[in-house]
A protein has these predicted regions:
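Acidic, glycine/proline-rich Ca2+-coordinating loop motifs
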Residues: 18-185
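Bacterial Sec-dependent N-terminal signal peptides
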Residues: 1-27
């Protein structure tokens, strides 16, 4: 008998909770169209910030650079934010799959300088997946570890370790530190 009352009570609870509420066109906290939430974010054009990066992916059915041959083709890459020159400002590093990695030095006031070429960050670069900052050699300067992967030969997937040369440039030394792993990262 108690079981029947419990089933009846549960059924009534479900039926009551499923009734349709009339739509309310009055503005309120939940009606975003009538009362938009103000945003704390503001879009800054690349012409103002100096940051201009696009991880463009181009598939090619004649090679392994396509979704059919490489399941993770559209997984994307990575971004890292850290102070590479000890000036107290966070710099930005983008990894690119089929495009070069990019390093932007923070000049303050949301202005950045592209130091990719002079920083020597694309040595032995292939398909970069991600980035980690760490002071590997314990000298007080952030080094950069880049994981490599992609639909390339295993011998071309060595992860990269860029040791900070303390002058906004880096030297690739993954082999010297035993960190040139070839597994897909």
């Amino acid at each position: 008998m108690l079981k029947n009352y419990l089933i009846l009570g549960f059924t009534l609870l479900v039926v009551i909770s499923c009734k349709e509420e009339p739509s309310n066109s009055e503005p309120n906290e939940l009606n975003h169209e009538l009362n938009p939430i103000s945003s704390s974010f503001k879009k800054i054009q690349s012409s103002v910030s100096g940051i201009d990066f696009n991880n463009t992916i181009t598939h090619d059915l004649n090679t392994k650079f396509n979704l059919f041959d490489y399941d993770f083709f559209y997984n994307g890459a990575g971004v890292g934010i850290e102070d590479i020159n000890n000036d107290g400002l966070k710099d930005v590093f983008f990894t690119g799959n089929q495009v070069p990695n990019k390093l932007y030095l923070n000049k303050g006031g949301l202005k950045f300088e592209d130091i990719t070429e002079t920083a020597n960050i694309n040595t032995n670069k292939n398909w970069s997946n991600g980035i980690t900052f760490a002071d590997v050699n314990n000298d007080g300067w952030m080094d950069i570890y880049i994981s490599q992967g992609g639909p390339v030969d295993e011998n071309l997937r060595n992860n990269l370790l860029l040791i900070n040369q303390k002058d906004n440039s880096f030297k690739e030394e993954a082999n010297q530190y035993g960190l040139n792993d070839t597994g897909i990262s």
